[in-house]
């Protein structure tokens, strides 16, 4: 999606965009923190896309950061099943993942984890805003530090910047 956006908007060399997008997306998903291009200059859509990727993180068995794709997948199936139960109130719909039933206890723990993750994110972002940082830096700094991603978004902690220029209070 990001690659198609860059080709349409910039109309530059196809291969350069493909390599840059794939590298930066994998870097954000895996939490390695490397960047090849200043993706904050690609426009607003990539910033939102990378912010979402910071939250999602990698796969379940990896040591990457974020909520993890497995939990997001289970949450999606849970919401879908709840909507189906609203449409078909008498239906018995079990949540299945890889052809096996997901226990209610696991669903509850995943929803609790995601809820706490988002709550902590909003608390961190609010605290960073109180230190005098702008909105984009506060939001991306909270997401980046909570998800252990590395690069943030915005001018102060963008792809080719670091956290050294932030106020001391925000580093604690």
Give residue spans per PLM region.
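Membrane-proximal intracellular helices of multi-pass ion channels
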Residues: 1-172
């Amino acid at each position: 999606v990001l690659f198609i956006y860059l080709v349409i908007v910039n109309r530059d060399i196809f291969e350069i965009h493909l390599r840059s997008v794939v590298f930066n997306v994998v870097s954000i998903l895996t939490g390695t923190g490397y960047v090849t291009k200043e993706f904050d200059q690609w426009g607003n859509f990539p910033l939102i896309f990378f912010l979402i990727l910071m939250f999602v993180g990698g796969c379940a068995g990896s040591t990457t950061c974020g909520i993890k794709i497995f939990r997001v997948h289970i949450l999606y199936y849970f919401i879908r099943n709840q909507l189906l139960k609203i449409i078909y109130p008498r239906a018995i719909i079990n949540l299945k993942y890889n052809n096996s039933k997901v226990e209610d206890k696991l669903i509850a723990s995943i929803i609790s984890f995601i809820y706490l993750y988002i709550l902590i994110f909003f608390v961190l972002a609010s605290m960073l805003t109180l230190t005098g940082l702008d909105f984009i830096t506060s939001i991306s700094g909270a997401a980046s530090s909570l998800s252990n991603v590395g690069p943030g978004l915005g001018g102060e902690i963008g792809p080719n910047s670091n956290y050294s220029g932030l106020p001391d209070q925000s580093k604690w």
